[in-house]
Amino acid sequence: MMLPRRLWALGAALMILPMLAVTACASTAPPPPPESRNGRPDRGAELIAQYGCGSCHTIPGINRAGGLVGPPLTRFGARSYIAGQLPNNADNLRRWIADPQAVEPGTAMPNLGVSAIDAQDIAAYLYTLD
């Protein structure tokens, strides 16, 4: 009588394990931290056009921003990583925008001389793209 119960328990466990594995591996991007909302998104949009970011990137809401060199910035706020390696948070994004070569030497993204305040506003705009 104990054997059928053990077999039932083993069968149930074997059915549940794959579901747990899939659930554990599912990755949803964490929401950007509250400090990422600092800055002025409206000004950030203007700066993105001014610095010519759309020459390399496709950026929603920015006129003539259909570049295909860099990755599209669609749904940027929902991403887990910046440049494929940095956790997506406001500090990392501001550092990346201001001086990408200091963050990842040899990256294709050029250093455009973006000031700290401009980087903050550009980051604020990008975080609206979620």
Tell where the protein language model's regions lie, with residue ranges.
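Bacterial N-terminal signal peptides that target proteins for export
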Residues: 2-15
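Short, structured helix-loop boundary elements
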Residues: 7, 38-41, 70, 90
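C-terminal motif of bacterial Sec signal peptides marking the signal peptidase cleavage site
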Residues: 21-24
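Electrostatic cytochrome c docking/interface patches
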Residues: 26-49
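Short, non-ligating residues that shape and space the ligands of small metal-coordination modules
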Residues: 31, 62-63
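Extracytoplasmic electron-transfer domains, predominantly the class I c-type cytochrome c fold
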Residues: 46, 64-130
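The −1 position to Zn-ligating cysteines in a subset of zinc-ribbon hairpins
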Residues: 52
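Helix-to-catalytic-loop junction in kinase catalytic cores
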Residues: 57
